[in-house]
């Protein structure tokens, strides 16, 4: 079975501004490096379809989604750093659709595994809020599709982005079908290191200058026992 590569053209066409960290160039660079290394010939490429309303509302409240649509019509900001335009909101729905379809293809046996290469990002978006360039939590949409539609009893969401997955924690805290393991730079956005809010969440703040091998050693010591005990049917890694 092949590895799936899920993406969409909106990733490359909409910019949040010259000072934004979420820029089309980061997706372009991945495509360029894949072509240079011949990885592109070893994956099956899928152009994402937009997520359904049901996919989105398993994660976000109707009021929040309406707020995003209202802001998009004005081209207004959700937070100081997070712009909402029709194009960015369309991209967020496509990114969620890519994540859901990737999980569906893995679970039905069409693919061995999948890489979802999309923007805008999502893990700072909670049930009723967004921020940090995140509008829709695409990983959360994929997890909820897996547990509520596709038959998974347990899903592990492993987040190793430099920033804390505050949106994902807001969505999944207390959900016994999901194990959230989150490592992040302790001094980075969203600022302040709060303890995990539920037993199914493990936060691993890392000090500035932590080496990769040091972080890996902590993950092996603190996370692997939890993963073995949880025995997930599916694991998602947010990078």
Say what each PLM segment does:
Residues 2-146, 152-153, 205:
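Metal-dependent C-N hydrolase catalytic cores
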Residues 100, 104, 115-236:
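Conserved alpha-helical scaffold segments that buttress catalytic/binding sites
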Residues 239:
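Calmodulin-binding IQ motif helices
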């Amino acid at each position: 079975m092949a590895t799936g590569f899920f993406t969409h053209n909106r990733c490359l066409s909409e910019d949040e501004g010259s000072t934004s960290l979420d820029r089309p160039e980061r997706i372009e660079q991945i495509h360029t490096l894949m072509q240079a290394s011949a990885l592109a010939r070893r994956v099956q490429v899928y152009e994402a379809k937009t997520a359904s309303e049901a996919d989105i509302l398993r994660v976000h409240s109707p009021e929040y989604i309406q707020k995003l649509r209202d802001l998009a019509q004005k081209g207004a900001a959700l937070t100081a750093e997070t712009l909402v335009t029709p194009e960015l909101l369309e991209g967020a729905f496509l990114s969620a659709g890519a994540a859901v379809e990737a999980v569906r293809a893995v679970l039905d046996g069409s693919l061995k595994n999948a890489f979802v290469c999309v923007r805008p990002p999502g893990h700072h978006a909670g049930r009723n809020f967004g921020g940090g360039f995140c509008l829709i939590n695409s990983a959360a949409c994929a997890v909820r599709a897996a547990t509520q539609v596709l038959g998974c009893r347990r899903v592990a969401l492993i987040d190793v982005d430099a920033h804390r997955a505050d949106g994902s924690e807001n969505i999944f805290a207390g959900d016994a079908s999901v194990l959230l393991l989150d490592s992040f730079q302790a001094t980075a956005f969203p600022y302040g290191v709060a303890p995990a809010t539920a037993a199914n969440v493990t936060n691993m703040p890392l000090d500035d200058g932590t080496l990769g091998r040091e972080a890996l050693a902590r993950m092996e010591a603190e996370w692997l026992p939890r993963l073995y005990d949880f025995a997930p049917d599916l694991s998602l890694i947010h990078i």
